[in-house]
Amino acid sequence: MVNWVGKRMRRLGAIASMALTLAAVAPADAADALSRVLAMPKASLLVEEGGREAISRQPDRPMIPASTMKIVTALRAIQRWGLDHRFHTDFHLADDNWLWIKGLGDPYLVSEELDLVVATLKRQGLRSVAGVGTDDSLFAADVQIPGRSSSNNPYDAPVTALAVNFNTINVVRSREGVRSAEPQTPLTPLARQLAQPLASGTHRINLQERELAVRYAGELLAAKLSAAGIPVGGGLRTGRVPAGAARIYRHHGTRDLRAVIESMLEYSNNFIANDLFLLLGDDGDGQPLSTAKAQRAADAWARKTFGWRDHRIEDGAGLSPGNRLSARQLLDAVKAFAPYRELLPSQNGRVRAKTGTLSGVSTYAGFVQRNGGWEPFSLLINQPAPHALRLDVADELAGAPPGLR
């Protein structure tokens, strides 16, 4: 058994004992990242090898997990719906010939999906509509995601049951005017309006408010209908689908849950994570889905699945600084996620893990490849730290030279 990690940890006073030690000797400079983490007062680290704890540093201390919370959300979604699940959106035609789109929480309703919708409606015989109505009532009107700010950053986009293109608009502003930055996405009146004050360049605009997000969904659908030769007579309405309106089409997204989760984890998409978080709060009572309902569902799941107690899950993306998980709790989720390990982002082929970053928070959790197998780890740093430190720790655990990513 190799003793160098054990000696380092004894010198640092990080742990009293260790079940196993790292199996491969690493150069002294490669060990620096691990030593630094073990010396940090506000850092927790838990590594298993062969089903036993290999490194344990403050494993039961509640910490802010940041975006590693997305592993928990992904696991819950898979357990609830299965990897083959496809989200859907309903389309209704009212007696006054208004076409209504009812959002049911599909997080990946993008421009290309609307093209498929319009093509199907046209094939079914839709020739014109009096106007487009939008129904976003699945989510409560007062939904507020803890930790989400009102900034224009795309990761702060509002979470709505009816959302297109992740509630963002991609535009190019130049001296010639404004144009869409995406060939598949026509420029709508709202997009033009929001882009006017911007400096020259390409911009991803966060729609910021629920009303703007729902309006944009209606405008984009109307533009797609018109482009396909289906005239839209009136304007836009927002409300509930009128009683008696016939459902003429249910569109199932082309991406299954596997693809949705893989994208969420790779790009750390907060919109997708919190959309799933709200949907997971559906208890079948027919009431709008709220943040409070989603939080209660998450807490009940954590207690039933893992027996957690000293935890707090305020949102599904890890945006909230009020979230709390210990390294041991996060490792519980990581180990349960083992069958879906390849959905996690890859680091140099020897690490599959999810990062998390907030101000003064740097986290990393997933799997490192060691001795022909994949071993789980969770690292939670709740104090200022270099961005690359967590990656270097994972490299070190995997026996790879730091920085080769």
What residue spans do the PLM features occupy?
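N-terminal post-signal-peptidase region of extra-cytosolic proteins
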Residues: 58-59, 73, 112-119, 315, ...
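Bacterial N-terminal signal peptides that target proteins for export
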Residues: 4-16
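C-terminal soluble interaction/assembly domains
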Residues: 312-405
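Short beta-strand scaffold segments in enzyme catalytic cores
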Residues: 44-47, 89-93, 365
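Conserved serine DD-peptidase/penicillin-binding transpeptidase domain
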Residues: 32-34, 63, 79-308, 400, ...
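Active/ligand-binding-proximal structured segments within catalytic/core domains
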Residues: 64-77
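A short glycine/serine-rich beta->alpha loop
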Residues: 57-63, 207, 317-320
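Beta-lactamase-like hydrolase cores
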Residues: 19-20, 24-65, 81-86, 120-129, ...
